[in-house]
Amino acid sequence: MQRQVVIEEFKQRNLNQPYGDASHLLRALAYKVHPYQWPTIGKEISHIANATLEEVKAFFFKYYAPDNAILAVTGHITFEETVTLAEKWFGPIPRRNVAPRSLPAEPRQTEERRLTVERNVPVDALFMAFHICERRHPDYYAFDMLSDLLSSGRSCRLVQHLVQEKQVFNSIDAYISGSIDEGLFHITGKPAPG
């Protein structure tokens, strides 16, 4: 196990840059029951440093198997070539019964939750999130389109209105989390000075 590599990745993404832990803080605020409240890599370095090889292996064999894998292939290759190569490289891996996915549903949020963090960062930042439907729900694609309409490109609604016209933000973005279960619609921005 390359523990130090994972620790360095955690530091690089979460500790060594301004706002690096913003998504961790926001998820912990947005989710009270569902495991989405915890980052995959862990909440702190001790989670990585204290993980035993036995725990990592047990987790791997519980959740990682050909039975629940997805293979994405791109490039100049035919379907037949893809099948041949997939069978060659992945066919020998034995099937295993993986644990059924059983996660608690996040209760409906009925109140606003806020967290103010004061740090020495280059500029203030705003991170907001709103609960949205699961990825398999038909409305998921409407949220995806809405996030693009609001923040993709210089002519998008949020940039035109809040950055160019009102000049209350220097930058603003909207995006959705691609979660299997109910996800989040994010709005992030850097307010203009003053």
Residue ranges of model-derived segments:
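M16 family metallopeptidases and their MPP-like homologs
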Residues: 1-2, 8, 19-46, 68-74, ...
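Extracytoplasmic/secreted envelope proteins and their assembly/folding machinery
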Residues: 3, 7, 19, 23, ...
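Histidine-acidic residue clusters that define the catalytic metal-binding segment
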Residues: 9, 28-69, 97, 101-106, ...
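A generic secondary-structure signal for well-formed alpha-helical elements
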Residues: 10, 14, 81, 89-97, ...
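Solvent-exposed, non-transmembrane alpha-helical starts
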Residues: 16, 136-139
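An aromatic/glycine/proline-enriched structural segment found at the starts
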Residues: 32, 37, 65-66, 70-134
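Short beta-strand/turn micro-motifs at beta-sheet edges
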Residues: 35, 57-61, 113-117, 171-177
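Active/ligand-binding-proximal structured segments within catalytic/core domains
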Residues: 128, 138-150, 158-162
